[in-house]
Amino acid sequence: MIYPGRGASLSVAVALVLFSSGAPWTFREEKEDVDREVCSESKIATTKYPCVKSTGEVTTCYRKKCCEGFKFVLGQCIPEDYDVCAGAPCEQQCTDHFGRVVCTCYDGYRYDRERHRNREKPYCLDIDECANNNETVCSQMCVNTPGSYRCDCHSGFYLEDDGKTCTKGERAPLFEKSDNVMKEGTCSATCEDFHQMKMTVLQLKQKMSLLSSNTEINKQMTNEKMMMTTNSFLPGPPGPPGPAGTPGAKGSSGSPGQMGPPGLPGPRGDMGPIGPSPDLSHIKQGRRGPVGPPGAPGRDGMKGERGFPGPSGPPGPPGSFDFLLLMMADIRNDIAELQSKVFSRPLHSSFEDFPSAPDSWRDTPENLDFGSGEDYKSQSPPKSSRKRKLPRNLKNPDWPV
């Protein structure tokens, strides 16, 4: 698919928009843009709209496009119903593809993209069918022609009707010349020429008989004449296209297309050679200045791992037994209240029911100097105090065990 240039190129470029200041800008399009279009004689509509530059200044910008009912083809604004192939812009075949010119080559020709890119003609080159025997299938000789080929036979052979097969011998003549001897200066015709003219007249009559208005001519056609007009004398399929004509004059170059998108970044190049070392002898170095104030403290770091346990400390002083006695007294009061609620009668209870703590259990100035452990065990009370019996009033049967 190719798109050659055609005629004088009309620059419908957007460069006029940026000629004012050359600074980068942005635009703000409004709804009234359609009403501001002005169509010129070249069918190019110019639209004005406000735009804002990068500096914040509001200015007027212009945008160009084809007027309504026109389309942009090969740098020109032409009517939408205009045939772009009317001026024969292509070398061989032209197709209107939605307003674009599509040039193709005939059968038997190939399109050379490089020649067309360099604007060299002809860019539709002939295909040598004889170079590949599988395409021609000629039994003996193949002769390449512009856009096609033909088969020939050696001496003593003749070409069959298929145009490819050669048969040994000579072809028998289909028609012989008339035996009538014509005088010099007169026209003579062979039987073959006469037969062809007769068949042509019969074919014309057959076509006319198909028309509804020519009923009388249809009646005059006999069965014998209808039998003679067989399919063998009907016109055959169209032949291959003829050779290409001489190329025309070179047209003017078209308008430059729009700038394409930027390509992908290329690979990073190799590092260049290291330059010479700088000369620092001319740089003066003074005395180092004072140390500045410390900066702001940084953020707290992550919590560290737990350290190893430290050594065991010395034993502490012995504990007091008074707290345990108070707790037992509270439990006794709770039990007494529970019994009074269950049995509905008061029970005898006194603080004397509990044995008093031995003097050796109380905190004395002598015991405060001792710590826990073996040192405290050495100060155990005498056996007489440890075997002290409980009073008999604790053997009350009403006391729950």
Curated annotation (Swiss-Prot):
This is Collagen and calcium-binding EGF domain-containing protein 1. GO terms for cellular component: collagen trimer; extracellular region. One of its GO terms (biological process) is lymphangiogenesis. It is found in: Secreted. Keywords: Angiogenesis, Calcium, Collagen, Developmental protein, Disulfide bond, EGF-like domain, Glycoprotein, Repeat, Secreted, Signal. Residues 126-167 form the EGF-like domain. Belongs to the CCBE1 family. Glycans are attached at N134. GO terms for molecular function: calcium ion binding. Changing D162E: In fof(hu3613); lacks the thoracic duct and the previously unidentified intersegmental (ISLVs) and dorsal longitudinal lymphatic vessels (DLLVs) but retains a seemingly normal blood vasculature. InterPro entries: Collagen, EGF-like_Ca-bd_dom, EGF-like_dom, EGF-type_Asp/Asn_hydroxyl_site, EGF_Ca-bd_CS. It comes from Danio rerio (Zebrafish). The keyword Repeat applies. Not expressed in blood or lymphatic endothelial cells, correlating spatially and temporally with the migration routes of endothelial cells that bud from the PCV, migrate in association with somite boundaries and seed the horizontal myoseptum region from where lymphatic precursors later migrate. Residues 1-22 form the signal peptide. The gene is ccbe1. Residues 246-258 have a biased composition (Low complexity). CDD domains: EGF_CA. Residues 234-276, 286-319 form the Collagen-like domain. Residues 229-321, 344-401 are annotated as: Disordered. Residues 235-244 have a biased composition (Pro residues). Disruption phenotype: Significant reduction in phosphorylated mapk/erk in the nuclei within the posterior cardinal vein endothelium at 32 hpf. Loss of facial lymphatic vessels including; lateral facial lymphatic vessel, medial facial lymphatic vessel, facial lymphatic branchial arches and otolithic lymphatic vessel at 5 dpf. In a svep1 and ccbe1 double knockout model there is complete loss of the facial lymphatic architecture at 5 dpf. Disulfide bonds join C130-C142, C138-C151, C153-C166. Required for lymphangioblast budding and angiogenic sprouting from venous endothelium during embryogenesis. Required for the formation of facial lymphatic structures. Necessary for lymphangiogenesis, but is probably not part of either the vegfc-vegfr3 signaling or sox18-prox1 transcriptional pathways.
